[in-house]
Amino acid sequence: MISFDLIVEDDSWAALGDLEALCRKAFDAAEYVAPVEEGNIALLLADNHVLHQLNLDFRSKDKPTDVLSFPSLPMDRPFLGDIAVAWGVSASDAKIQGKPLDAHLVHLLIHGYLHLLGFDHETDDEAAEMEALEIKALASLDIANPYRND
C-alpha cells in the first residue's frame, strides 16, 4: 500500500477541499494499475515559482511545469520518491482543457506515480504504455480519458 506525506506550500490548493482524500484516491487508482507491495511518496503541492526552480535545477528547463517526479534509488525503498505539482500551471491547463481541476490533479498524481516506478514517455511505445495505464486508473474513478480530443 502507498503512503504519502503531503506538504502544501501554496494556499490556492485549499480550493480543492480535502486534499488528503483526493490524493489518497489518486494513489489508490495508480496502485490499482501498477501495484507495489509498499511505498512512501513525498508529495509537494506548490506554486509555479517552486516548480520553475526545480525544473531549472534538475532538467535545465527555464520555465514552470505542471508536475515533476524524482524517483528514489532502489536501495532507498520503500521510499518511492518525490512528486511536486504547480498550482498555476495545473489550474491553467485544466481550464484550457475544460477539465475539473480535481480530476486534472488526480491525473497528474497518477502520471507522477508511474514515473516513480520507472515508466516514461520518451518513445512512442513508452508513451502508449504509460498513457494506457493512466487511462485505466482514471477510468476506475470515472474520470474521462485525458488524451482523447472530443
UniProtKB/Swiss-Prot annotation:
Compartment(s) of residence? Cytoplasm
Principal localization?
Answer: cytoplasm
Which Gene Ontology CC terms are recorded?
cytoplasm
Cofactor binding: number and manner: Binds 1 zinc ion.
Q: Cofactors per UniProt? A: Zn(2+)
Q: Note the Gene3D superfamilies from the entry.
A: Metalloproteases ('zincins'), catalytic domain
Taxonomically, the superkingdom here is Bacteria
Coiled-coil spans are: none
* Residues reported in the UniProt entry to bind Zn(2+): 111, 115, 121
Molecular function in Gene Ontology: metalloendopeptidase activity; RNA endonuclease activity; zinc ion binding
Q: Which UniProt keywords apply?
A: Cytoplasm, Endonuclease, Hydrolase, Metal-binding, Nuclease, Ribosome biogenesis, rRNA processing, Zinc
Task: Return the EC number.
Answer: 3.1.-.-
Q: Which GO BP annotation is one of this protein's? A: rRNA processing
TM spans (from-to): none
Top-level EC class, please? hydrolase
Query: What does this protein's UniProt record list under function?
Result: Single strand-specific metallo-endoribonuclease involved in late-stage 70S ribosome quality control and in maturation of the 3' terminus of the 16S rRNA.
Family, per the entry?
Belongs to the endoribonuclease YbeY family.
| This protein's name | Endoribonuclease YbeY
Q: Which organism is it from?
A: Hyphomonas neptunium (strain ATCC 15444)
Q: What lineage, starting at the top, does this entry show?
A: Bacteria, Pseudomonadati, Pseudomonadota, Alphaproteobacteria, Hyphomonadales
